[in-house]
Regions:
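Loop-helix junctions at membrane interfaces
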Residues: 1-170
Length: 170
C-alpha cells in the first residue's frame, strides 16, 4: 500500500511539473522568431534531478506534446524527443557525476541536457523539418548557455528548499 501511495504522489508531482513547464514555456515566454527565452526546462530538469532520468524525459516530452496541442502546433516527434532528452541526459548526468560538488554536478548536468536536447536534437529538427539555415541556428547556442546558467541558479535554490525536497521524497 505504501508503494501505491508513493507512486500516486510521484505521478502527482510529475503532473504538476508538466503543468509548470507548459506555463513557463508557452505563457511566460519571450520569443524573437526562431529563439524563445523561457524557463520551460526548469521543471524538466527538476524532475530529472529529483525523480531520475525517466521522469525528466517524461515531463519534457509530455509538456512539449500538451503545450504544442494547446498552442495549435502540429506535433513534431524530433522536437518532442529534444524536449525529453533535456531531462533524460540531465538525469543520467546527475546520477553519474555524483563525485563532483553539488554546484559543479548541477552545472554539468544542465549543460549536457541542454546541449543534447536543445542545441543538437532540436536544432537538427528545425533544420530538417523547417529548413532553418545553420547560421540562424547558431544563435541557439548562446540562448542555451544563458538559459542553462539561469536554470542552474534556480535549481540550486529549489534543491535547498527543505519543504519542497521533503514533499518530493515522501
Amino acid at each position: 500500500m505504501n508503494d501505491k501511495k508513493t507512486s500516486v504522489r510521484t505521478l502527482t508531482m510529475l503532473a504538476l511539473l508538466v503543468a509548470m513547464s507548459i506555463v513557463f514555456s508557452r505563457v511566460l515566454s519571450i520569443s524573437t522568431g526562431f529563439v524563445r527565452f523561457n524557463l520551460g526546462s526548469l521543471p524538466v530538469l527538476l524532475a530529472a534531478v529529483v525523480f531520475g532520468p525517466g521522469a525528466g524525459f517524461a515531463v519534457g516530452a509530455v509538456a512539449d506534446i500538451i503545450g504544442g496541442v494547446l498552442a495549435g502546433y502540429a506535433i513534431n516527434p524530433l522536437i518532442t524527443l529534444g524536449a525529453g532528452a533535456i531531462g533524460l541526459v540531465a538525469g543520467f548526468a546527475w546520477q553519474k557525476l555524483n563525485r563532483l560538488s553539488t554546484n559543479l554536478r548541477l552545472a554539468a548536468s544542465v549543460l549536457l541536457g541542454h546541449f543534447v536536447g536543445s542545441i543538437v536534437i532540436t536544432s537538427l529538427a528545425l533544420r530538417l523539418f523547417y529548413g532553418y539555415p545553420w547560421a540562424t541556428l547558431a544563435v541557439r547556442i548562446p540562448n542555451a548557455l544563458i538559459l542553462s546558467a539561469v536554470n542552474v541558479v534556480l535549481l540550486r535554490i529549489l534543491l535547498e528548499n527543505r519543504s519542497l525536497m521533503k514533499l518530493a521524497k515522501k
